[in-house]
């Protein structure tokens, strides 16, 4: 419990110690930089979250465990009592008024620790839990951010792996565009050739018609020119005779 209180007090006072100036001889200089060398790339064992067990708020449990095999269960207490009596008998430590003051202060401290220690420990634990929660939240946010970056990178890699499909689509689109252009030009050539052929056919038909008309006119002209006056009179007389004969036949037929 005392160790947690000391650690909380040290964590609270650390920012002020970092910003402190040179205070004087015998005082810790917080601005001094330690461990300036390159860090070692070896696995560092994690620090324990809680300190070791202690007895009477001061003596570590390991001390008793070390003496138990050699002195028994009561050995540490006998050793401590013997050391105190030895110091008093040899006047290494002399009892004075300050001794009673120290005992009174120690009793008050023990009473305060026993009564208010759990509340202070709970308060320190709550502060520690809040800090751990903030650190855990930051850790989870960082993990989520890194996971999102990994997912984005994977999606980008998947797109890169599938880019040949895009190239194939573009290649097919270009081939289709070239095919459409080729068909359009081929149709344009077909229409142009057809128009020219139609033009030549029209010209040939017109020339053939003109030749026929010219031939008919030429033949008719020469036939008319070849008829003499006597032949014309005979032809006219024969036509008149034929008409008279037809008229007589028409009159001779009874009317139905």
From Swiss-Prot:
Residues 1-42 form a transit peptide. It holds the Pfam family Mt_ATP-synt_B. GO terms for biological process: proton motive force-driven ATP synthesis; proton motive force-driven mitochondrial ATP synthesis; substantia nigra development. GO terms for molecular function: proton transmembrane transporter activity. GO terms for cellular component: membrane; mitochondrial inner membrane; mitochondrial matrix; mitochondrion; nucleus; proton-transporting ATP synthase complex. The modification N6-acetyllysine is found at residues 139, 154, 162, 221, 233, 244. Keywords: Acetylation, CF(0), Hydrogen ion transport, Ion transport, Membrane, Mitochondrion, Mitochondrion inner membrane, Transit peptide, Transport. It is found in: Mitochondrion; Mitochondrion inner membrane. The modification N6-succinyllysine is found at residue 131. Gene3D superfamilies: 1.20.5.2210. The keyword Glycosyltransferase does not apply. Its main location: mitochondrion. Belongs to the eukaryotic ATPase B chain family. Component of the ATP synthase complex composed at least of ATP5F1A/subunit alpha, ATP5F1B/subunit beta, ATP5MC1/subunit c (homooctomer), MT-ATP6/subunit a, MT-ATP8/subunit 8, ATP5ME/subunit e, ATP5MF/subunit f, ATP5MG/subunit g, ATP5MK/subunit k, ATP5MJ/subunit j, ATP5F1C/subunit gamma, ATP5F1D/subunit delta, ATP5F1E/subunit epsilon, ATP5PF/subunit F6, ATP5PB/subunit b, ATP5PD/subunit d, ATP5PO/subunit OSCP. Subunit b, of the mitochondrial membrane ATP synthase complex (F(1)F(0) ATP synthase or Complex V) that produces ATP from ADP in the presence of a proton gradient across the membrane which is generated by electron transport complexes of the respiratory chain. ATP synthase complex consist of a soluble F(1) head domain - the catalytic core - and a membrane F(1) domain - the membrane proton channel. These two domains are linked by a central stalk rotating inside the F(1) region and a stationary peripheral stalk. This is ATP synthase peripheral stalk subunit b, mitochondrial.
């Amino acid at each position: 419990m005392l160790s947690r209180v000391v650690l909380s007090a040290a964590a609270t006072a650390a920012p002020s110690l970092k910003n402190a100036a040179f205070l004087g001889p015998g005082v810790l200089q917080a601005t001094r930089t330690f461990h300036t060398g390159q860090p070692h790339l070896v696995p560092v064992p994690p620090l324990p979250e809680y300190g070791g067990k202690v007895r009477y708020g001061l003596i570590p449990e390991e001390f008793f465990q070390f003496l138990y095999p050699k002195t028994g269960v009561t050995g540490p207490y006998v050793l401590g009592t013997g050391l105190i009596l030895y110091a008093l008998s040899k006047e290494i430590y002399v009892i004075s008024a300050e001794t009673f003051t120290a005992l009174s202060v120690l009793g008050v401290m023990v009473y305060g620790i026993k009564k208010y220690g759990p509340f202070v420990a709970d308060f320190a634990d709550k502060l520690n839990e809040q800090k751990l929660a903030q650190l855990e939240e930051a850790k989870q946010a960082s993990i989520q951010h890194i996971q999102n970056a990994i997912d984005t990178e994977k999606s980008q890699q998947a797109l890169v792996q599938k880019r040949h499909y895009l190239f194939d689509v573009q290649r097919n689109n270009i081939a289709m565009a070239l095919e459409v252009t080729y068909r359009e030009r081929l149709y344009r050539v077909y229409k142009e050739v057809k128009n020219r052929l139609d033009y030549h056919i029209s010209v040939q038909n017109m020339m053939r018609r003109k030749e026929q008309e010219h031939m008919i006119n030429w033949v008719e002209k020469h036939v008319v020119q070849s008829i003499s006056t006597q032949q014309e009179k005979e032809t006219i007389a024969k036509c008149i005779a034929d008409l008279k004969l037809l008229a007589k036949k028409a009159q001779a037929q009874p009317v139905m």
